[in-house]
Amino acid sequence: MTSDGRPNRYECGPAPENQPPPDTTGMDRRAALRVGVTAAVAAGSVALGFALRDRGANKKTRALPTIKDHRAEKPAGATDMAIVRGPDPAANVRKAIEALGGMGRFVRRGERVVIKPNIGWNRLPEQAANTNPDVVAEVVRLVVAAGAGKVWLTDASVNTPEQCFARSGIEKAAKAAGATVVRPDASAFREVNVSGKLLRTGDVLFPFVEADRVINVPIVKQHGLSLASMSLKNWYGVLGGQRVKLHQNIHLSIVDLAAMVKPTLTILDATRILLANGPTGGSLADVKQMDTVAAGSDEVALDAFGATLLGLNPNDVGFIVEGMKAGLGTPQWKNLKTVELGG
């Protein structure tokens, strides 16, 4: 509730009653990906793979690495955001990046780049629970063509990673385009400082520690707790361990992770969007064909645009509001220098 007794627009609560139980295929293996933390926390809960901030303690932070700021300097007069509509997902990606000034604006020759799609679920592309594989493959091709010295592609899947990476079509498409695919086994994580309002440390996939550039490639979909899952929410997939504890304050934890990563570029996949029963989906009746890709470096602006595709007011999406407050971007995407093509 707000101070004047009105309901908080984005207060976390239980998922809607008509929300189906999550697909738990492979969750035993997922639970096995707890890295670095073995002690029980908070009322006997299991190890999480990250540490919540202890507001009552004044302990020194351990000497852990911090993920560097991956943002690229914006050239004078450059376009902030590109929105492209058309039937060919790969062409939409190319046109969006061209409108921003080309991949060379974001990736320099020899740099190490990690690409982060959503590969959380054991779903087919048509079910719109994961990023479209054609979108992902084109991003990889553009990064390779820009001269990147190393291109990783990774995500910490919720369902069994082997199934998610294969059934989504992303692993095959990314490898064919030139990426090194990193599955989230226990050896793939490194503990880092998060230094957020809620999160203190976390076990993250190692490419995010080693990369020079980070490219976020999320899908637009409804989410039962956070209302939507898009750019900012996609950073849950860098963490090892069980992430359910973060749902108790989902909007702040989303912003903590986004502030930790600070990506170079975000390419928002709205080829197909999931309108209901997210984030897992499953029914084609919940999927809408949008044939849209948006790209830019302001994740808050991109998520505000994505929210409108889901029929949401960006001001009602907590992580968009909190992201703006944290200085991660603006929800006023129409005020940015934006190019719209097609449609």
Where are these regions (language model features)?
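N-terminal and secondary-structure boundary signal
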Residues: 2-343
